From Swiss-Prot:
Gene Ontology terms describing biological process: proteolysis
Cofactors that this protein relies on: Mn(2+)
UniProt source species: Clostridium perfringens (strain 13 / Type A)
Cysteine-cysteine disulfides: none
Gene (UniProt): pepA
Binding-site list for Mn(2+) 1: 265, 342, 344
Active site: 272, 346
Name this protein carries in UniProt: Probable cytosol aminopeptidase
Tagged with keyword Protease: yes
Amino acid sequence: MYNFLVKKSKCTETDALLIPYFEEKTNIPNEEINNKINILKKKEQFKGSYGEIFNITRTTDDNIQDIILLGLGKETEITKEKIRRAFGKAVNEIKRLKSKSVFLRFDSVEAIGLENTLKAMVEGLALGSYSFNKYKSDKKEEVEVTVHIGGHNINEEEVELCEKAIDEAMLLSETTCLARDLVNEPANNMYPETLAKEVKNIGSKYGFEVEVFDENQIEELKMESFLSVGKGSDNLPRLIVMRYFGDKDNMDQRLALVGKGLTYDSGGYSLKTNAGMVTMKADMGGAASVIGAISAIAKRNLKINVIAVVAACENLISGHAYKPGDIIGSMEGKTIEILNTDAEGRLTLIDAVTYAIEKEKASEIIDVATLTGAAVVSLGEDVTAVITNKDEFYGELREASYETGEKVWQMPSFEDYGKLIKSNIADLKNIGGKYAGTITAGLFIGEFIQNKPWLHLDIAGPAFSEKKGDYCPTGGTGAGVRTLYELANRRCK
């Protein structure tokens, strides 16, 4: 596993020199390197096209053995996300060369700015270096790669800005990878009790309070909907509450992050196929997202009050498990007809949302969940589906997503959709039928938000990947961590 220790420095003896290179204008302040690049361009072996990587091995007596040219395409077309992805690709070349120290020649992209350019580069390197090898018996020796950062046009006044950008990028990468680790843990080791213990350790490390409620305390709170989902498992449910108060002068303003915490989902009596169950350790991707986000927020001491709530349980089959046709209650008081036990996440979320509002006095709600396959069908694997009752709130999320490169898309929430989740024999039913599954699932949760500003994020697509991306590995991706942090961070400026 590669750990990138990124710091501002002058170019010293390193194994490799990493040069970001634009097609039309990159002037390397080294005649030998410029000559080599010009020869490569004449031979059309390297043009600087976006994503292109070429390695030059030094033959002269020099401290730097390898020069890695990283094509960024046209400077007029570059974005922060393109930078992240390009540098994520560069990790593979660094690994191939077995470089233990790399000097990154860094120049600001004018349209993006010094801090944002550097932050995107560091995130690409740090996020792209992630791997999950905990359970492999033949573990490769952990290699620590030091990346020195410098540029010929960075003056002394900009050094502090660079260091702040690096620190923030490394923290966001660290907490995103924390979320990835939580998702990647197998369900036989990551169940409600162990998740709760892990969150306590995380809270101690990053600086937020953690309170855990056991099954008896959950029952006292009248969270029947949440408890019903977990009844089939011998691993008892836990309600995990995280609190960070960074703005004690405005305690009436509390942003609640509510994450779906199904540490395993078999579908219950509405049983999934074997193929559908294989990745269901990832059904707590929403929980991982809010845990990662509050960790970053607390560590940066942002001036904001945040409550994170996770209703953690397993959805399994037993003689005690809930069944299709059951009618159950909820903490808020509404009754629910169960038509499908595999529509369980929303049942845990509604009690968690009610708890956040009534007990933690949340003024705004964001729930995050791997909720519906319909979200993947409609938007693909890379986009988060969003339902909201306040367009301005969604606007904040959208602007934050532009910064992080995590794609979001607002789904319609016309009033008529709400009719699809009304029951003839209870207040609501837990599925809305054949059509608009992502929308009706979100609106089901919306029935419990008590007129608070609310965002519902369905991350069923981006939370877990079965193919490697440029800076996202296979498995848990940590989707949502950086965007939730960025939304909170923008409110503090």
